[in-house]
Regions:
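Alpha/beta catalytic cores of nucleotide-metabolism and tRNA/nucleoside-modifying enzymes
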Residues: 1, 13, 20, 24-35, ...
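Short beta-strands and strand-loop turn motifs
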Residues: 3-7
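Short, small-residue-enriched loops and turns at beta-alpha junctions
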Residues: 8-15
Length: 159
């Protein structure tokens, strides 16, 4: 298989990915093609496959703080366009806690928590009070700090 991104490195994140490049590669080769670029969820994954003929899609930035995007895409593509509900706040909290716990287990709490700040901030996108939660995520130093933030997130979500 070959993976093709619809943008050059020099373009970085702008403009939108040019999916016609992916289609041109797919039309030119006989091996599976994986399309990448601006796949943000189930509908964009489906649209990319329809527009380019690619065999699979690759998700990049859309997975940051949203590991559920893979579940969403799989359900949509394999279950007749089934739309998955977004994860509940308790589910998000469990995943955040486990992710950061594993990160700290691998890198030590001090280094792990410094790296965790960006991950926790990504997980907060779209939630009630997200801006304030992201600010607090930038100040996390310990797993205990994370637990306090997650309790606050849970409380906010229930009001």
């Amino acid at each position: 298989a070959i993976c093709v991104h619809g943008r050059t490195r020099a373009q970085m994140y702008q403009p939108y990915a040019d999916w016609s490049i992916i289609k041109a590669v797919k039309d030119a080769v006989k091996i599976p093609v994986i399309g990448n670029g601006d796949v943000t969820g189930a509908q964009s994954a489906c649209r990319m496959i329809e527009e380019t003929g690619c065999d699979m899609v690759m998700v990049g930035r859309a997975a940051l703080g949203n590991p559920w995007v893979f579940r969403e895409i799989n359900a949509y593509l394999s279950e007749s366009c089934r739309i998955m509900p977004p994860p509940s706040v308790p589910e998000r909290i469990l995943v955040i806690r486990r992710h950061i716990e594993l990160l700290c287990g691998d890198k030590g709490e001090n280094r792990g928590m410094r790296e965790a700040r960006k991950h926790v901030a990504w997980y907060m996108h779209g939630l009630k009070g997200a801006a304030e939660m992201r600010k607090k995520a930038g100040e996390l130093c310990t797993l205990e700090d994370l637990d306090c933030l997650l309790k606050e997130l849970y409380t906010l979500s229930n009001h």
